[in-house]
Design a protein with these regions (language model features):
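Transmembrane beta-barrel domains of Gram-negative outer membranes and organellar outer membranes
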Residues: 25-302
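Bacterial N-terminal signal peptides that target proteins for export
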Residues: 2-10
Length: 302
């Protein structure tokens, strides 16, 4: 079954990367925070990789492949596959996530509101930091053979607030994770501030929140140009659980770091975020990297 999943995903990647369609939407600038849905009939493919300096075990790499599609101008659905490689151990498959999110109101407001749901069919060896919640760290603390055969199913919900001022975006996500194999909920949050690059290689358009999603210059800037650079800051952390909600700093993971994007071409955008752990149970360093490719009018070509 796992081999079939990998083959299907490889075929999908080859189809997307082999297409010559024009980019009209950019990869979300954040690694953890989410805001507006994809434009209608737009597909985004993202390849994400983290290097994590572990707090209590060997350092490791994690990877995630993500595909999202704009079903309507307010509704996006997608899926993710992830895995990890701990130094001294074999590469391990982490599981699948299926997500969907909807912008509640059709027009721009002072605070725009998106609701998000995600089904996670993971195993105990899954280490990719899509979010953090609850208490304690997440380094692998049991034998790998046991962890990879331990199912960890979760339903994640997010209430997302955001607003745009020109090219500047402010986003806040409240996260609730409900264990489907355990009782109780774990809570977390993430927020970010990001300034989009002046040049993005896109047609002049606005995102779902009224944000100027890119305006092509009369002349494309050189490949090495500050006009292609976007920058900001992102923070994520835990907020306890059903029995104890709130900030209990030294018992919860908290991370913060600068986030950068660079427009490589009409089709490609690269992202990087060196994130530092702020508490005793956080990993000291998470170096986050990603590359995204987007095509518009996937099913309804102009």
């Amino acid at each position: 079954m796992m081999k079939m999943r990998k083959r299907y995903f490889l075929v999908l990647l080859l189809f997307v990367f082999g297409s010559g369609a024009v980019l009209e939407a950019q990869m979300d600038p954040y690694f953890t925070a989410l805001n507006y849905p994809m434009p209608r009939d737009t597909m985004m493919v993202m390849l994400l990789s983290d290097y994590q300096s572990a707090r209590s075990t060997n350092d490791f790499f994690t990877g995630m492949s993500m595909v999202e599609y704009g079903l309507t101008s307010r509704w996006t659905a997608g899926f993710m596959e992830e895995g990890q490689k701990i130094y001294g151990m074999p590469t391990t498959y982490g599981g699948t996530r299926i997500n969907s999110y909807v912008r509640v109101f059709p027009h721009d407001h002072l605070l725009n509101f998106t609701v998000y749901g995600e089904y996670e069919d993971l195993n105990g060896a899954s280490l990719y930091k899509m979010e953090v919640s609850g208490f304690g760290g997440e380094d692998l603390s049991e034998p790998l053979a046991l962890a990879r055969n331990t199912r960890a199913r979760t339903f994640e919900q997010r209430a997302i607030l955001y607003h745009d001022w020109g090219r500047v975006n402010l986003t806040f996500d409240f996260i609730n994770e409900t264990g489907l194999d355990t009782s109780g909920n774990d809570f977390g949050y993430t927020w970010g501030v990001f300034r989009q690059p002046e040049y993005s290689g896109m047609e002049s358009d606005k995102g779902m929140g009224g944000m100027a999603m890119g305006k092509p210059n009369e002349q494309t800037p050189p490949m090495l140009s500050l006009q292609r650079l976007g920058y900001g800051i992102e923070m994520m952390g835990a907020l306890g659980d059903t029995n104890q909600f709130g900030f209990y700093w030294q018992r919860q993971q908290q991370y913060v770091g600068p986030v950068f994007s660079y427009t490589l071409s009409k089709n490609w955008t690269a992202h990087v975020e060196p994130t530092s752990g702020l508490t005793a149970v956080s990993d000291p360093l998470v170096l986050r990297m990603g590359i995204g490719y987007s095509i518009d009018h996937l099913l309804h070509r102009r």
